[in-house]
Regions:
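Membrane-interface helix-loop-helix junctions at boundaries between adjacent transmembrane segments
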Residues: 77-78, 83-149
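N-terminal signal-anchor module of multipass membrane proteins
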Residues: 1-53, 57, 319-323
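Loop-to-transmembrane alpha-helix initiation sites
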Residues: 120, 124, 229-237, 258-260, ...
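Membrane-helix cytosolic exit motif
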Residues: 276-309
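C-terminal ends of transmembrane helices
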Residues: 58-70, 106-117, 189-200, 242-251
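Structural signature of hydrophobic alpha-helical transmembrane segments
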Residues: 42-55, 92-101, 172, 176-186, ...
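Long hydrophobic alpha-helical segments that form multi-pass transmembrane helix bundles
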Residues: 117-190
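Hydrophobic, membrane-inserted alpha-helices
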Residues: 29-36, 60, 78-86, 102-106, ...
Length: 323
């Protein structure tokens, strides 16, 4: 009987979740997108994923080795960063540029700030933004699925969203159009999302709130729900909502905070897409959301049961004088 009693100090939290287990679930959830990109764009897509992931793992191992830090390669976080970063690139991206992105993501964004748990933003997200700013022409060199790697598409469905018939909904659902490797196939993203929710790796709050906000605002702005649906299925909205905005370290942990965070990202994405100079604003919206996370947590903090707000000093003095 005594062996069944807990005699340690509180809090008594019993959870079998580990960083490696959670990251392993994310890797599994990313596999449909990886497989879809290989089927749609060919073996070059797999090569880009392998090289980028290997570079992320290598940079993490070398950095920690040189600075005599505990090796964290085994927690799979670098693997997740590598896969997500690769899926945020077009299939024709030169491999050396992918390695540059891996360096920015792992060394600059993650390790220099203290490693996993201390980074200010999602490492893969920062890597994508830096590559987009530094190699814009390469990052926008989209490839049609049925063409060779050097045959470039003129625009993605998001850029062509004015034309309702530029790409059919079925083609968008199956990924039969140009774009970033991991963003084109809606089916693969939804399969990964379903797995993450089923394994309780993430909650639905953030992704659903982001997509719903963009859909509602776009419908109100255009008066066309079909156009809003096209916007939600194109670009990096779905992929970013599921795999990047839900990062444990850089997203809120309170329920209200998650709602504020999702609405904020959806709002910024909508504003950039419709009133900014870029077709896609998801990356910048998530980055701003990451930076705002401490405030979202503070605003969403639940008041303890039985808590009584202290009276202001002046009001308390007046009541004391009346007494």
């Amino acid at each position: 009987m005594e062996d069944r009693l807990l005699v340690t100090a509180s809090p008594h939290i019993r959870d079998h979740s580990t960083t490696r287990g959670l990251m392993g679930n994310v890797v599994i959830a990313l596999l449909p997108a990886v497989l879809a990109s290989a089927l749609i764009f060919g073996a070059r897509a797999l090569l880009l994923v392998v090289v980028t992931t290997f570079a992320c793992v290598a940079f993490e191992y070398i950095y920690e080795r040189l600075l005599h830090k505990t090796n964290t390669v085994g927690d799979l976080s670098a693997v997740v960063t590598g896969i997500i970063l690769a899926l945020n690139m077009p299939v024709g991206m030169p491999l050396w540029i992918a390695v540059v992105g891996a360096f920015v993501a792992i060394v600059i964004t993650k390790q220099l700030f203290g490693g996993l748990g201390y980074n200010f933003a999602n490492p893969a997200l920062v890597g994508r933004i830096v590559l987009f700013l530094g190699f814009t022409s390469r990052m926008t060199a989209y490839v049609y699925p049925d063409m060779a790697v050097d045959a470039l598409a003129s625009a993605t469905p998001l850029a062509s969203s004015v034309d309702r018939h530029a790409v059919s909904l079925l083609d968008m659902f199956l990924g039969l159009h140009g774009g970033m490797m991991g963003e084109v196939c809606v089916l693969a993203i939804l399969l990964g999302f379903a797995y993450l929710v089923a394994t309780k790796t993430i909650q639905v709050t953030i992704p659903v709130t982001i997509v719903a906000t963009v859909f509602i605002l776009t419908t109100l702005n255009t008066g066309d729900p079909y156009a809003a649906l096209i916007e939600c299925m194109s670009g990096g909205l779905l992929f970013g909502s599921v795999f990047m905005a839900t990062d444990y370290v850089t997203s809120p942990f309170t329920t209200k905070g998650k709602l504020f965070y999702g609405v904020f990202i959806g709002l910024i994405t909508f504003l950039i897409r419709h009133f900014g100079s870029m077709n896609e604003g998801m990356s910048y919206a998530i980055l701003l959301g990451n930076l705002m996370t401490p405030w979202f947590n503070a605003w969403g903090h639940q008041t303890p049961l039985g808590y009584k707000k202290p009276k202001k000093a002046k009001k308390a003095a007046e009541e004391g004088g009346k007494a």
